[in-house]
Curated annotation (Swiss-Prot):
Source organism (scientific name): Mycoplasma pneumoniae (strain ATCC 29342 / M129 / Subtype 1) (Mycoplasmoides pneumoniae)
Gene Ontology process terms (BP): DNA repair; DNA replication
PANTHER family from the UniProt entry: CHROMOSOME TRANSMISSION FIDELITY FACTOR 18, DNA LIGASE
InterPro entries: BRCT_dom, BRCT_dom_sf, DisA/LigA_HHH, DNA_ligase, DNA_ligase_AS, DNA_ligase_CS, DNAligase_adenylation, DNAligase_N
NCBIfam families: dnlj, PRK07956.1
All copies of domain BRCT, residue ranges: 584-654
Residues reported in the UniProt entry to bind NAD(+): D31, F32, E33, Y34, D35, S80, L81, E110, R133, E167, K279, K303
Task of the protein: DNA ligase that catalyzes the formation of phosphodiester linkages between 5'-phosphoryl and 3'-hydroxyl groups in double-stranded DNA using NAD as a coenzyme and as the energy source for the reaction. It is essential for DNA replication and repair of damaged DNA.
Protein name: DNA ligase
Cofactor: Mg(2+); Mn(2+)
Annotated gene: ligA
């Protein structure tokens, strides 16, 4: 008992030091004193491993390497916020809420950190899961990396399940230090944070000193918190890092003044922000205000006015996209813009270049449109010389040299050669992307290599790639047996993605992810959409004449119909997936946790999809006391079976997914 008490006391002391150092930025002891106490704890734990505490600072150390991150559905969807680009919109937002609720409300203003959103789950006081935002419905569990962030508590004094959300980021100073030592620097701090958080080796995360701020608790009423201010106070009490730049206001005029002042001083912060979030403080009115189809009505993001910087335009890169559209991109002298090193900016199309009279070697003003894509705003004409020559118009496709066309009422030029190699490559790359069929393991470089070697010349060829294993392994792609099998598994899994993702991946002009999902509400499958008349298409709420014509023409093109037939022949499902709210809740498998081991007649990914749709299950790679069932196939891992037996976890040997 004496050793337990000694270890517990050291853990609490180190946690206190960590909180003051990483959260309050107020060190209590020197690094030497901290290290000595840490080494004392390590020695005690090595001598008594059975006494290691789950919240011990030694449990944060990186070095865990995982093959992949497991995906899990969010308990509550992680929605985006609607944006306001001026203070008048914010004032209107506040007035509308006050009118609807009938009272003068308090509003909380929080910095919108330019980082990576994270959702932490604590069970019985212990941090058990850390999900990225993902698509808002499903995220990746990056717990092994999050545990290396020393400002995040591993335990909290609350013994029910609770979800806590925040933002993980890299501060400006750390970003500059890390980039100094990289052969290929990160373009911005957000990319560095995202890449670090998704690195499969947690040792990388431990070295990069990620930071975090927390600001939201879904279902906060279960904590007894009746306002956002109370949530932030509770988070501070639990030693979570909360931004000092949070403020609250009873008067709209004072809030607006704060927004304007913050915009002028934000560069003084040591972290990148891309706006401020204005939230209604009182939770009592949240249900009354509700949500739009995309956003909560009780919060709004105020986006800062774009900043402008000056640089030299050294050249123009002309490329062709999957639809044949020609893109003009300015090649710039590198310049820092809003925390990002920018060396390229969009010029849109040649009409834009002519309208702005942009020339080679001009000094130009660039800015970030919506804080995302750099654009060329204008030319600094007083700095122009006679040596600045006009940019020539592209008349032929830069990839296949086919003549370009410009359609009536459009400003863009197009390559109409359907056999253009670059167009086909971009089309395949888009088809496998996360927003479309989500086939993992295929970069544009890999696709290009497969294309050059006649292994993948169209999206249909992806589904025959398993027949060319030897040829793929022979290429210099750094793809071995294990990665090849994972790639094939991901390709096979994509067959079940359904109509919306397939429609997105086909790259039909004017049909993106949102419209594709909308079409599945009106047509039960691709065949029904293919049979739709122009009149039927024009009756749809999200379809105008241009989109209707594009859809109708695509589905009446012989080449496209042959493509659909070939995809159907290899087993790609073309029905609209219905969201399953009719789980088998009476089953013993409903919402249980599974480990899958061994081989089966169908892929593990397919099994997981079937079990999720039927029982709303969860999955993990390791057998622990938190696992409910082990699903064992042929040649199941003996160690996992032994662990299951030791923990009295049922082992299933039958196809429960059918």
């Amino acid at each position: 008992m004496a050793k337990v008490a000694q270890i517990r006391a050291i853990v609490e002391q180190l946690k206190r030091y960590d909180y003051h150092y990483y959260v309050l930025d107020d060190p209590l002891v020197s690094d030497f004193e901290y290290d000595q106490l840490y080494k004392q704890l390590q020695a005690l734990e090595q001598a008594h491993p059975e006494l290691i505490q789950p919240d011990s600072p030694t449990q944060r150390v990186g070095g865990i390497v995982v093959e992949a991150f497991n995906k899990f559905p969010h308990q509550n969807p992680m929605l985006s916020l609607d944006n306001a680009f001026d203070t008048a919109t914010i004032a209107s937002f506040i007035a509308n809420i006050n009118n609807l609720t009938g009272v003068q409300n308090r509003f909380v203003v929080e910095p919108k950190i330019d980082g990576v959103s994270i959702s932490l789950t604590y069970e019985n006081g212990l941090l058990t899961r850390a999900l990225t935002r993902g698509d808002g419905l499903v995220g990746e569990d990056v717990l092994s990396n999050v545990k290396t962030i020393k400002s995040i508590p591993l335990t909290i004094p609350f013994h029910k399940q609770v979800e806590i959300r925040g933002e993980i980021f890299v501060d400006k100073k750390t970003f500059a230090q890390i980039n100094e030592n990289l052969a290929k620097p990160f373009a911005n701090a957000r990319n560095l944070a995202a890449g670090t958080l998704r690195n499969l080796n947690s040792e990388v995360s431990a070295k990069r000193k990620l930071k975090a701020f927390f600001y939201f608790v879904p279902n906060a009423l279960t904590l007894g918190c009746r306002s956002q201010s109370a949530v932030l106070a509770q988070l501070k009490q639990w030693n979570f890092p909360v931004s000092k730049a949070v403020a609250s206001f009873d008067r709209p005029e004072a809030l607006i003044e704060y927004l304007e002042q913050f915009d002028q001083t934000r560069d003084q912060l040591n972290f990148q922000v891309d706006g401020l979030v204005v939230k209604l403080d009182n939770f009592h009115f949240y249900d009354q205000l509700g949500f739009t189809s995309k956003f909560p009505r009780w919060a709004l993001a105020y986006k800062f006015k774009p900043k402008f910087v000056q640089t030299k335009l050294r050249g123009v890169l002309v490329t062709v996209g999957r639809t044949g559209k020609i893109n003009y991109t300015a090649q710039l002298d590198p310049v820092n813009l809003e925390g990002t090193v920018v060396s390229a900016a969009t010029l849109h199309n040649f009409d834009y270049i002519k309208e702005k009279d942009i020339r080679l070697n001009d000094t130009v003003i660039i800015y970030k449109a919506g804080e995302i894509i750099p654009k060329v705003l204008e030319v600094c004409l007083p700095l122009r010389t006679a040596a600045n020559q006009p940019i020539p118009e592209q008349t032929h496709c830069p990839a296949c040299q086919a003549p370009l066309v410009q359609y009536k009422d459009e400003v863009d030029q197009y390559c109409t050669n359907e056999r253009c190699d670059q167009r086909n490559l971009e089309a395949i790359n888009y088809f496998v992307s996360k927003t479309a069929m989500d086939i993992q393991g295929l970069s544009i470089q890999t696709i290009s290599k497969l294309y050059e070697n006649n292994l993948v010349r169209s999206v249909v060829d992806l589904y025959h790639l398993k027949e060319h294993k030897a040829a793929v392994l022979a290429l210099e792609l750094k793809i071995g047996e294990v990665l090849f099998n994972k790639l094939i598994s991901s390709i096979e899994q994509s067959k079940t993605k359904g109509m919306a993702r397939l429609l997105t991946g086909l790259g039909i002009k004017h049909v993106g992810q949102v419209l594709a999902k909308s079409l599945t509400k009106h047509f039960e499958n691709i065949d029904a959409l293919q049979s739709a008349s122009m009149e039927t298409l024009l009756e749809l709420p999200d379809v105008g004449p241009t989109v209707a014509e594009s859809l109708f023409n695509w589905f009446h093109n012989d080449n496209n119909l042959q493509l659909l037939a070939a995809l159907k022949a290899v087993g790609v499902q073309m029905d609209a997936l219905k969201s399953n709210t009719n789980f088998d809740t009476a089953s013993i498998y409903f919402q249980k946790s599974f480990v899958i081991t061994g081989s089966f007649p169908i892929s593990r990914d397919t099994i997981k999809n079937l079990l999720v749709n039927k029982y709303d299950c969860r999955f993990t790679n390791n057998v622990t006391s938190k696992v409910d069932f082990v699903l064992a196939g042929i040649k199941a891992t003996p160690r996992k079976l032994e662990q299951a037996k030791a923990l009295n976890i049922p082992i299933i040997n039958e196809p429960i997914w059918t």
